[in-house]
Regions:
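Catalytic cores and adjacent flexible loops of soluble metabolic enzymes
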Residues: 1-251
Length: 251
């Protein structure tokens, strides 16, 4: 069992989410970690606004490294490094996780968490992989996250200007798409890809509307093909023109 607590390196963002200051929250987090440890529950410490804050603007990667170290110092079991609003760019993701692994090289302690708001989270995933990160958080269909408001089982715009205008911006990178990406890079992962794609399609049927995965529609890169879609007559035409079956260029 595990629970999660989150801090933002930019204090205005942190205050908007928690209602308290960073120093006060750290005290509460340490108290909660001790309580959890007493009953065998692990604590995952989240660091947010690593690559920028939607409220305070630019942030320093070095601050996020310090926050990561402090989480571990007060007893967190592992760290979720979160891009909660899709601010990250691939070069900065690589730079950050290189800094993290130089400081704390145990990859089992680190989890990458990328929200999809600009259709570039797959590039961030690749950059984190290249830096050496092994663990990623994803959700089927990209569900979760902002906005937290639902009406008739559908995500709707949150209240206030802080929320995205488009309620489809509701969560993490899609598990289906990320898994296909990793699988086709030849990286071992231990998942049944076809089963995950099936689950993604079933989830869309369950919620009753289109989610964000492209892989559940377009599938994996074909290796066998679909000859039932072939235009009839190619073999006869090649024979008529005096071409061999596998000839690609004129002689």
């Amino acid at each position: 069992d595990r629970v999660l607590m989150m801090v933002s390196t930019e204090e205005q963002h942190h205050f908007a989410n928690s209602g308290t200051t960073l120093p006060n929250y750290w005290k509460e987090a340490e108290r909660c970690i001790k309580k959890c440890s007493e009953v065998g529950i692990k604590m995952c410490g989240t660091v947010s606004t690593i690559w920028g804050s939607p409220i305070g603007g630019a942030t320093k990667l070095e601050d996020a490294v310090k926050f990561t170290r402090h989480w571990l110092d007060i007893g967190a079991s592992d760290i979720e490094h979160a891009d909660h609003d899709g601010s990250a760019s691939a070069p900065e993701v690589y730079r950050y996780f290189s800094m993290i692994l130089d400081e704390i090289p145990d990859t089992s302690l680190h989890i990458a968490h990328f929200h999809e708001t600009k259709r570039v989270a797959s590039a961030s995933t690749l950059a984190a992989l290249q830096a050496g990160i092994c663990h990623f958080e994803c959700t089927l269909g990209g569900l979760g996250g902002q906005p937290a408001n639902f009406l008739d089982d559908r995500p709707i715009k949150g209240t206030g200007d802080y929320y995205y205008d488009d309620p489809r911006y509701v969560g993490l990178v899609c598990l289906e798409d990320t898994l296909v990406q990793i699988d086709e890079m030849g990286i071992e992962h231990g998942y049944d890809v076809d089963r995950i794609l099936w689950l993604g399609r079933q989830l869309e049927k369950t919620v009753g509307f289109r989610l964000r995965s492209e892989a559940i529609i377009n599938g994996r890169t074909l290796t066998e093909g679909h000859m039932e879609y072939a235009r009839p007559g190619l073999a006869k035409l090649k024979e008529k023109l005096g071409e061999s079956p596998d000839q690609k260029f004129p002689e």
